[in-house]
């Protein structure tokens, strides 16, 4: 509905006791306003779906099954489970039940505001209660306010014309001011002498079945009158009432407004405060409509929208008094055609009062929602609800792919990108994509640091001469110099606020011209990196090793390396870690969770980096290349090992075959191949040993630390797995046998792989005997029993064997027989 300035003038026929002359004095001025400010909200649509679901009848369906299916469809249209979360659906159900249990005088009022949450509904009711309480207090403290409001203080005793003048007869300027300032239906009394107007006031106060003797009764009557009338209003009138409450202030007359003689105005609320409500109600029921003098149309008495504001007179102008006063509240006026709440601190605009109240807590620091467990406070109830799940352990948002649960729905959305491989956040500079927005922000900071470094290098070359020292240089030349410098930066794609443009020349120019250096504008939200520190600067430095970091959080994590602090402890096994992400990865060892699955072969991993390394197996990609020989590798660790070949450190070399090793232990393991050669003297133990497995193991024990010691015999081991296996010799537990050779004392790599794998997961089965194996390689070795294959041969005697462990045992027999 388009806002118009039309006004309807309605005669009110008084009771039989009043004279026809007094009936001609009452004129109602109604302003038609726009009632579409709530359009576009989802709440009215949801209300429609709710009413359809609530009022569905059984006879509307073809049968019980059809009725049940239609109810399900209507319920889904109302609750929208595919769009709304579980919390939103619960909030909607609680809101509908809350509106149902409200008193009847509040239900219609609150529903017309279309609250979207229980908090908004409570805010509307509290606002109504505060306004009603203010009206009671105002009437209780000023009993004489009613007669004074109805008589203008500046009126004279002159005799006026007794003719009823329509509102259109008023001067144009005064009519326009009233339309703009007073969005109220006004009872206007024209051409009434002061004496007659006083008689009219006394008549209104005295007529009716009962007389008002207490000001408290007047306030109660006003409240009951308002709530009764609200239920009988049409949509446009209710919207008009909402707009007046949304403005939260009383109507005022402009300061320059001076009423003409014979022009006495007072609002409907003054009549409802002064007159008996039963008279008003009876008059409404008896008179269904009254004649408009200019159009002849019939209008109901209920078209008068009850208001609580008072229309002041020229003798006592009053300013608007907002119900929620404060310097931070700045509302948009009706002249702009907008209604809402604007924050006085940051300028943000909100249509709903509840959103504005939540936003104000950011500036005030108010946190009304407190956790009863730990005492933490939050400014929104939803944040408290999410925090309480930390204490209860509730994780309602579960991934349907891997079963992982989360406390917050946004974390589940981010987790879905792990399975889908989606990277929606792309960098406009290099085209690289990321799965999370925070990762994109960190990546963009690197680009800005690179640009800052280029600007710094360019500035160091071009700003060695201070242009302020050049004699005869005018202000125009300074401006031209700065413009040239800015164009050079813009040509390279730098932001407007880069340090190069506001470098030494720019500062000198601004100081010379007396301009402020605060006019720097940035074209990107991440350009604060320029302002925060100089290009390439790492302000956070470690006092122990001197390493620098850009962010203080990284420095805190780094210091834990020196202090040995490990604040993140596993409750299952007691292990501690210095970073939370490491603890999260460790938890997956206990839970068996492997959220990172390969979409090609289905293999899952606990850590994302392991999945990335695994994917190079399918793609045959070798991103890590050697700069010396050009050889590529799929893993960085493999490249690091290869680079040692090109280094000068080649001290560990096999004297038999010439192969080079960078670790002495690797050389010892390699020399097992040469066990058939003559024995050498052990330089570490000063004893003569043959090059067999015993010597190699003893040398490894001497070269390495042995922190794991047996409590029974005192034997020490380098690895915890060796200690666990040693414990079996003291206990009655039988050690696990090798799947290939069925030997419990076997130390070949097969038994180690077998111990790591799950015993129950033997997916590879032998077709001959039905025996199962956890690894396919074990099955291949086992099948040599049925086929009789012996691929391993002794070079000394030519004897063949099926397994490598059997060959090692045979080689030891040759060592004992050697002289």
UniProtKB/Swiss-Prot annotation:
Record's protein name: Zinc finger protein with KRAB and SCAN domains 5
Q: Which GO terms describe its molecular function?
A: DNA binding; zinc ion binding
Under the heading CDD domains, the entry gives: KRAB_A-box, SCAN
Query: Gene Ontology terms, cellular component aspect?
Result: nucleus
Q: Which residues form the SCAN box domain?
A: 51-132
Q: Which residues form the KRAB domain?
A: 216-287
For this entry, list what GO says about its biological process: regulation of DNA-templated transcription
Tissue/organ expression? Testis specific.
| Region Disordered: start-end pairs | 236-263, 283-340
Instruction: Enumerate the PROSITE patterns for this protein.
Output: KRAB, SCAN_BOX, ZINC_FINGER_C2H2_1, ZINC_FINGER_C2H2_2
Position of the Glycyl lysine isopeptide (Lys-Gly) (interchain with G-Cter in SUMO2) cross-link: 214, 246, 302, 700, 776
> What family, per the record?
Belongs to the krueppel C2H2-type zinc-finger protein family.
């Amino acid at each position: 509905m388009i806002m118009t300035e039309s006004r309807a003038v309605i005669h009110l026929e008084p009771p039989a006791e009043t004279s026809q002359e007094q009936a001609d004095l009452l004129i109602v001025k109604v302003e038609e306003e726009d009632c579409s400010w709530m359009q576009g909200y989802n709440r009215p649509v949801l209300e429609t779906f709710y009413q359809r679901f609530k009022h569905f009848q059984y006879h509307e369906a073809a049968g019980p099954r059809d009725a049940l299916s239609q109810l399900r469809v209507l319920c889904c249209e109302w609750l929208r489970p595919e769009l709304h979360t579980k919390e939103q659906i619960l909030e909607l159900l609680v809101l509908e039940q809350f509106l149902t249990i409200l008193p009847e005088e509040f239900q219609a009022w609150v529903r017309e505001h279309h609250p979207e949450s229980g908090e908004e509904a409570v805010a509307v009711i509290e606002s109504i209660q505060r306004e009603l309480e203010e009206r009671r207090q105002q009437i209780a403290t000023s009993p004489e306010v009613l007669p004074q409001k109805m008589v203008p203080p500046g009126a004279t005793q002159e005799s006026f014309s007794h003719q009823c003048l329509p509102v259109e007869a008023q001067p144009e300027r005064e009519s326009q001011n009233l339309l703009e300032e007073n969005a109220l239906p006004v009872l206007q009394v024209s051409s009434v002498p002061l004496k007659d107007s006083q008689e009219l006031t006394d008549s209104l106060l005295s007529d009716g079945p009962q007389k008002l003797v207490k000001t408290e009764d007047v306030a109660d009557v006003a409240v009951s009158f308002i709530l009764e009338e609200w239920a009988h209003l049409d949509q446009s009138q209710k919207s008009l009432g909402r707009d007046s409450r949304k403005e939260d202030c009383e109507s005022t007359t402009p300061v320059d407004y001076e009423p003409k003689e014979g022009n006495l105005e007072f609002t409907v609320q003054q009549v409802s405060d002064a007159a008996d409500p039963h008279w008003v109600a009876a008059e409404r029921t008896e008179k269904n409509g009254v004649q408009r003098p200019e159009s002849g149309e019939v209008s109901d008495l209920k078209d008068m929208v009850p208001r609580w504001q008072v229309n002041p007179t020229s003798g006592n102008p009053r300013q608007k008094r907002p119900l929620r006063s404060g310097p931070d509240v700045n509302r948009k006026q009706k002249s702009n055609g907008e209604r809402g709440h604007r924050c006085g601190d940051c300028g943000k605009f909100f249509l709903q009062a509840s959103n504005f109240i939540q936003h104000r807590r950011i500036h005030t620091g108010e946190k009304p929602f407190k956790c009863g467990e730990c005492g933490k406070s939050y400014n929104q109830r939803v944040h408290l609800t999410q925090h309480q799940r930390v204490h209860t352990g509730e994780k309602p948002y579960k991934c349907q792919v891997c079963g992982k649960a989360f406390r917050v729905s946004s974390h589940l959305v981010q987790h879905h990108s792990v399975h889908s491989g989606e990277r929606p956040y792309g960098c406009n500079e290099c085209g690289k994509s990321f799965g999370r927005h925070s990762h994109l922000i960190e990546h963009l900071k690197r680009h800005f640091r690179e640009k800052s470094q280029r600007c710094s290098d360019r500035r160091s070359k071009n700003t060695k001469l201070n242009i302020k020292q050049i004699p005869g240089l005018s202000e125009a030349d300074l401006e031209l110099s700065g413009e040239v410098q800015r164009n050079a930066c813009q040509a390279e794609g730098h932001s407007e606020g880069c340090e190069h443009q506001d470098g030494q020349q720019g500062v000198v120019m601004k100081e010379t011209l007396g301009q402020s250096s605060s006019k720097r504008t940035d074209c990107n939200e991440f350009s604060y990196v320029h302002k925060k520190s100089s290009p390439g600067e790492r302000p956070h430095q470690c006092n122990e090793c001197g390493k620098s970091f850009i962010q203080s959080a990284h420095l805190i994590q780094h210091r834990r390396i020196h202090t040995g602090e490990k604040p993140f402890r596993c409750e299952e096994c007691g292990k501690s870690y210095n970073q939370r992400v490491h603890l999260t990865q460790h938890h997956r060892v206990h839970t068996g969770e492997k959220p990172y699955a390969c979409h090609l072969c289905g293999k899952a991993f606990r850590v994302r980096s392991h999945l990335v390394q695994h994917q190079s197996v399918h793609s045959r990609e070798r991103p890590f290349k050697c700069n010396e020989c050009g050889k590529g590798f799929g893993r960085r660790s493999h490249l690091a090992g290869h680079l040692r070949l090109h280094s000068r450190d080649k001290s560990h070399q096999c004297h038999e075959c010439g192969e080079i090793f960078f670790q002495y232990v690797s050389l010892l393991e390699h020399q097992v191949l040469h066990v058939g050669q003559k024995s050498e003297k052990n330089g570490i133990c000063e004893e003569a040993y043959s090059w067999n497995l015993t010597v190699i193991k003893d040398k490894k024990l001497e070269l390495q630390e042995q922190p794991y010691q047996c409590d029974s015999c005192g034997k020490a081991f380098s690895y915890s797995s060796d200690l666990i296996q040693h414990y079996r010799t003291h206990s009655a537990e039988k050690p696990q046998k090798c799947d290939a050779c069925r030997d419990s004392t076997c130390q070949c790599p097969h038994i180690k792989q077998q111990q790591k794998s799950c015993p129950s997961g033997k997916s590879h089965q032998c077709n001959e005997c039905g025996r199962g194996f956890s690894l396919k390689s074990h099955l291949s070795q086992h099948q040599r029993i049925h086929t009789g294959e012996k691929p391993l041969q002794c070079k000394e005697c030519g004897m063949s064997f099926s397994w490598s462990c059997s060959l090692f045992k045979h080689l030891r027999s040759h060592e004992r027989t050697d002289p």
